[in-house]
């Protein structure tokens, strides 16, 4: 990458991970207000999907051309369905069931082990280079996430296994998105995967007896639309843009920033305490990103 493209790539990922991290705060506020998690997730992504339509139409020269592009094949539909199933429905549903038996912090730590699985599977399925510094960086990043969230994680049980499943579901989606190509543009693919995932989650939610609360305050509507549009449409769209520009391993390494932003946003919005160990976690996250993005000496271009 040129310096300008590299800076744009980093800015895109920082914006995406900030929006991801802030979504935990918005979600926490709404869940504490009594909103069933799966109903909240489902309607969040219905609204988020609809919010992508103007962007898809603008990028592709019309809504029909964006959603049903020329040359569309059943293979494209299958890929969009798979990404929606794994990235929206799979990740969020597994995360919800994990948090029934483990803390939100433990579930978040397990979810954000995603980069290490992307790095390992990316080596197998994508041919991404996995040098020693990158491996060390990924491990340090996992430790940094644990510290940034307060180091709260206990033994491995059923809940932890489900939480790990959410990370693996995200990993599968990342690999599919990077390995395959469709006729859909970035925003059209974002629309379809969020819509498909939302429908699956809502079907499960209503089948299990969950319902939207009878009364919603203006403040809660504000938090819901923030969760649905900037924190979902924005973060997912920027995430796909970044994946298209960089390798899966390098892109996913920046996911370590999302829980750090969640901690910082919680401090300012929810007035949660921020300990010294959490600051140490942030420093380790920064170190991990530097290591994962470093190139071994033999791969660096020779100086002129």
Model-derived features: where do they sit?
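Specific transmembrane alpha-helical segments of multi-pass solute transporters/efflux pumps
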Residues: 19, 23-24, 53-111, 147, ...
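Cytoplasmic-side transmembrane-helix entry/capping segments in multi-pass membrane proteins
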Residues: 76-82, 130-141, 160-163, 184-194
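Helix-helix packing/entry segments at the starts of transmembrane helices
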Residues: 43, 88, 92, 106-113, ...
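Hydrophobic/aromatic residues within transmembrane alpha-helices
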Residues: 30, 40, 44, 98, ...
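Hydrophobic/small/kink-forming positions within alpha-helical transmembrane segments
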Residues: 21, 25, 53, 84-89, ...
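Juxtamembrane helix-entry segments on the extracytoplasmic side of multipass membrane proteins
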Residues: 5-10, 33-42, 70-77, 150-169, ...
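Glycine-/small-residue-enriched transmembrane alpha-helix faces in small-molecule transporters
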Residues: 1-43, 48, 97, 152-179, ...
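Hydrophobic transmembrane alpha-helices of multi-pass small-molecule transport proteins
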Residues: 52, 121, 130-150, 167, ...
């Amino acid at each position: 990458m040129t310096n300008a493209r590299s800076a744009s790539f980093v800015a895109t990922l920082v914006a995406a991970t900030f929006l991801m991290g802030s979504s935990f705060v918005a979600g926490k506020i709404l869940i504490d207000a009594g909103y069933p998690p799966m109903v909240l997730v489902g309607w969040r992504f219905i609204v988020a999907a609809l919010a992508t339509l103007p962007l898809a139409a603008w990028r592709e020269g019309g809504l029909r051309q964006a959603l049903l592009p020329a040359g569309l094949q059943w293979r494209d539909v299958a890929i969009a369905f798979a990404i929606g199933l794994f990235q929206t429905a799979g990740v969020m549903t597994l995360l919800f069931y994990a948090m029934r038996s483990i803390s939100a912090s433990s579930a978040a730590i397990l979810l954000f082990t995603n980069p290490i699985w992307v790095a390992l599977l990316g080596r197998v399925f994508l041919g991404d280079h996995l040098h020693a510094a990158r491996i060390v960086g990924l491990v340090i990043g996992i430790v940094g996430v644990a510290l940034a969230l307060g180091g709260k994680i206990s033994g491995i049980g059923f809940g932890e296994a489900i939480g790990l499943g959410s990370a693996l579901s995200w990993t599968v989606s990342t690999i599919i998105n990077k390995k395959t190509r469709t006729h859909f543009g970035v925003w059209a693919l974002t629309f379809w995967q969020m819509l498909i995932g939302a429908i699956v989650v809502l079907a499960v939610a209503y089948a299990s007896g969950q319902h939207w609360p009878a009364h919603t305050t203006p403040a809660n509507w504000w938090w819901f639309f923030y969760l649905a549009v900037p924190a979902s449409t924005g973060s997912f769209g920027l995430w796909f843009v970044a994946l298209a520009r960089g390798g899966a391993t390098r892109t996913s390494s920046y996911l370590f920033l999302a829980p750090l932003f969640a901690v910082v946003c919680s401090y300012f919005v929810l007035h949660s305490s921020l300990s010294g160990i959490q600051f140490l976690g942030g420093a380790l996250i920064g170190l991990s990103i530097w290591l994962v993005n470093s190139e071994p000496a033999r791969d660096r271009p020779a100086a002129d």
